[in-house]
């Protein structure tokens, strides 16, 4: 198994500069911190950039989760992340989950669901950086991937906020972070508990990142072919 991990790590190192080079820029803030860049992009192009951004975040989060699992999580413990003690922090959020629910919600709620998910993960991913730094043998490629995702999630939030303003004419929209579950991170757990908690975070974020991607692609489909969006 370690040979496979090493090989995947080698490929990740080789491909990482390429992924950074081809990643879509979505930094809406200027040097003064004002979101003055994205408003000058057309709604269609902005949505395309956001989707490409979300696709890459989803892909890198999946790679990070798989690498972490192979390196640190013994096989008998991999199913425990689905138990009550390791519930996803976004489980209680009013996010549509079934296909029928997703199909029925409005464009506004699709965007609001994406924004809610993005904002709910910004602080937990910052926390994840501090815990991964304590691992003695965490490879740089894992640390770099999680750091990149954490940074790009903030850019994705900025893009979604501007898109909401463009599509829904909600110029006074403000962003708020969901901190309802962050207090559980105040006490540092022992190493095994920390591994399982980090594994849960990565696994849950992987699923939510995929959900963001699906919502955004459905929104794009509704803009182009409203009656044939499955």
Swiss-Prot record:
InterPro entries, per database record: 4_helix_cytokine-like_core, Somatotropin/Prolactin, Somatotropin_CS
Kindly state which keywords UniProt assigns to this record, in alphabetical order.
Disulfide bond, Glycoprotein, Hormone, Secreted, Signal
Q: Which family does it belong to?
A: Belongs to the somatotropin/prolactin family.
Tissue expression profile of the protein: Pituitary gland.
In alphabetical order, the GO MF annotations are: growth hormone activity; growth hormone receptor binding
The membrane spanning regions, by residue number, are none
- Which species does this protein come from? Solea senegalensis (Senegalese sole)
- Report which residue ranges the record marks as coiled coil: none
Q: Name one Pfam family in it.
A: Hormone_1
PANTHER family xref list: SOMATOLACTIN ALPHA ISOFORM X1-RELATED, SOMATOTROPIN,PROLACTIN
Give me any GO biological process, just one: response to nutrient levels
Q: Kindly indicate where the leader peptide sits in this chain.
A: 1-23
Q: Which residues are glycosylated?
A: 34, 144
**The name this protein goes by in its record:** Somatolactin
Per the record, GO CC terms?
extracellular space
Q: Where in the cell is it found?
A: Secreted
Primary location class: secreted
All disulfide bonds of the chain are: 28-38, 88-204, 221-229
Could you confirm whether the keyword Ligase appears in this record? Answer: no
């Amino acid at each position: 198994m370690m040979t496979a991990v090493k090989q995947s790590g080698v490929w990740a190192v080789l491909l990482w500069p390429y992924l950074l080079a081809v990643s879509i820029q979505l930094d809406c803030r200027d040097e003064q911190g004002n979101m003055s860049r994205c408003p000058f992009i057309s709604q269609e192009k902005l949505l395309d950039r956001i989707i490409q951004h979300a696709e890459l975040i989803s892909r890198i989060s999946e790679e990070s989760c798989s690498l972490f699992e192979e390196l640190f999580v013994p096989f008998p413990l991999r199913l425990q992340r689905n138990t009550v003690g390791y519930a996803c922090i976004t489980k209680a959020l009013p996010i549509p989950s079934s296909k029928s629910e997703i199909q029925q919600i409005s464009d506004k709620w699709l965007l609001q669901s994406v924004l809610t998910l993005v904002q709910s993960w910004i602080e937990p991913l910052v926390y994840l950086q501090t815990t991964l730094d304590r691992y003695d043998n965490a490879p740089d490629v894992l640390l770099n991937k999680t750091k990149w995702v954490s940074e790009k999630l903030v850019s994705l939030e900025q893009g979604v906020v501007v898109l909401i303003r463009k599509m829904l004419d909600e110029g006074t929209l403000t962003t708020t972070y969901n901190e309802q579950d962050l207090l559980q991170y105040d006490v540092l757990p022992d190493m095994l508990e920390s591994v399982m908690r980090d594994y849960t975070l990565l696994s849950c974020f992987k699923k939510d990142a995929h959900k963001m991607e699906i919502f955004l692609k459905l929104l794009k489909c509704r803009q182009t072919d409203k009656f044939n969006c499955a």
